[in-house]
Swiss-Prot record:
Pfam families: Amidohydro_1. Gene3D superfamilies: Metal-dependent hydrolases, Urease, subunit C, domain 1. This is N-acetylglucosamine-6-phosphate deacetylase. It comes from Rattus norvegicus. Its EC number is 3.5.1.25. Pathway: Amino-sugar metabolism; N-acetylneuraminate degradation.
Length: 409
């Protein structure tokens, strides 16, 4: 934790000639950074009588909060669901490579696996701050195995599980210690799921609804029990029906707890979700939309066969399938590509597209005071973008950790 005295002695950086995303608006203001946090310049001027130690001209570019990916299964040949002796080195490689896509924090995601995989892998993925070594790890997202057989998607049926009489004991027996976990995706129609949702929520773990055949009422009860997220909306759930809209209906439900915002993940890779569906979701509930990549280990690699947990995945162009089938198996589009596609598909504002990849995931995880914004006091994790939203540079705690060759920052 940064002490106030050491932070006060740290050099002050002033980013000039830029448009900063703050409060839902792109403002022509300078960004001030000291000790790894966003600084209020008025306090610097009037209370400390100080000016910047260094100025950096951003050439009119956009400065936005660093992107946060809460669902990423691996990438660049690394599979987070593979139980190796050195899972940490694979996570570190992905963390480093994500910097070029503007991602400053992420949740490594494990797909449905046998218990021995969770017991071996989870202790090797601790929460970790970001820096020059790579993006920070906010906690693990466990997607499965407590999901629907009918909507398992790319998850192997042999390892799916249900809850027994002592439901939360089953969770602990399956996963092992939950110290490194921040999100669990489950199907709310499973017996005793609400008992599990309450127990996980009591531990500060976010519960997401997904890979499910739940009707709207079951989904509403799950949210009333503590669930706050929907895993990749529209994918691996019942399609919207006018008499029972299923989980999708949560976006406009009037049965949620007062003041409760339901968040939902969207894979805006141009493959998983039709542009019309993106527009429907965004217009119905814009403040809950969270862009996710759902990237698989083939992210950053070429065509061919790769792994995802216990299964083989075949990449053909921009699409990843379970090998030998036409079942989609995650995405191979990085976060910056998803943001650009989302912007083009929905016609939303640049500000909305950027907040869907930064502020909203931070709010989902309860981290909005430190991540996902450029408010005074927040962590100085931010990305420098050109007008077409291509990443020019990435900063973590106010330190330049990646830049494009032509950026000159």
């Amino acid at each position: 934790m940064r002490s106030g005295q050491s932070a006060a002695l740290a050099p002050v950086l002033q980013f000039t000639n830029c448009r900063i995303l703050r409060g839902g608006t792109l403002l022509r203001e300078d960004l001030w950074v000291r000790g790894g946090r966003i600084l209020d310049p008025e306090k610097l001027f009037f209370e400390e009588r100080r000016v910047a130690d260094e100025q950096r001209d951003c050439g009119g570019r956009i400065l936005a909060p660093g992107f946060i990916d809460v669902q990423i299964n691996g990438g660049f040949g690394v599979d987070f669901s593979r139980a190796t002796e050195d899972v940490g080195s694979g996570v570190a490689l992905v963390a480093r490579r994500l910097l070029s896509h503007g991602v400053t924090s992420f949740c490594p995601t494990l797909v449905t696996s046998p218990p021995e995989v969770y017991h071996k892998v989870l202790p090797q993925i601790p929460v970790k701050s970001g820096g020059p070594h790579g993006a920070g790890v906010l906690g693990v997202h466990l997607e499965g195995p407590f999901i629907s057989r009918e909507k398992r998607g790319a998850h192997p049926e042999a390892y799916l599980r249900s809850f027994g009489a002592n439901a939360f004991h089953d969770v602990l027996a399956t996963y092992g210690p939950l110290d490194n976990v921040c999100i669990v995706t489950l199907a709310p129609e499973l017996d005793r799921s609400h008992e599990v949702i309450q127990a996980l929520t009591a531990k500060g773990i976010r519960v997401s609804l997904g890979h499910s055949v739940a009707d709207l009422r079951a989904a509403e009860v799950a949210v009333q029990s503590g669930a706050t997220f929907i895993t990749h909306l529209f994918n691996a759930m019942l399609p919207f029906h006018h008499r029972d809209p299923g989980i999708v209906g949560l976006l406009t439900s009037d049965q949620l707890p007062p003041g409760h915002c339901i968040f939902y993940g969207m894979i805006a890779d141009g493959i998983h979700t039709n542009p019309a569906a993106l527009r429907i979701a965004h217009r119905a509930h814009p403040q809950g939309l969270v862009l996710v990549t759902d990237a698989v280990p083939a992210l950053g690699l070429g065509n061919g066969r790769h792994t995802l947990g216990q299964q083989e995945v075949e990449v053909d162009g921009l699409i990843a399938y379970i090998a030998g089938t036409k079942t989609l198996s995650g995405s191979i589009a990085p976060m910056d590509v998803c943001i650009r596609h989302f912007l083009q598909a929905t016609g939303c504002s640049v500000e909305s597209a950027l907040e869907a990849a930064s502020l909203h995931p931070a709010q989902l995880l309860g981290l909005e005071k430190t991540k996902g914004s450029l408010d005074f006091g927040a962590d100085a994790d931010f990305v420098v973008l050109d007008d077409t939203l291509h990443v020019q540079a990435t900063y973590i705690s106010g330190e330049l950790v990646w830049q494009a060759e032509e950026a000159g920052l």
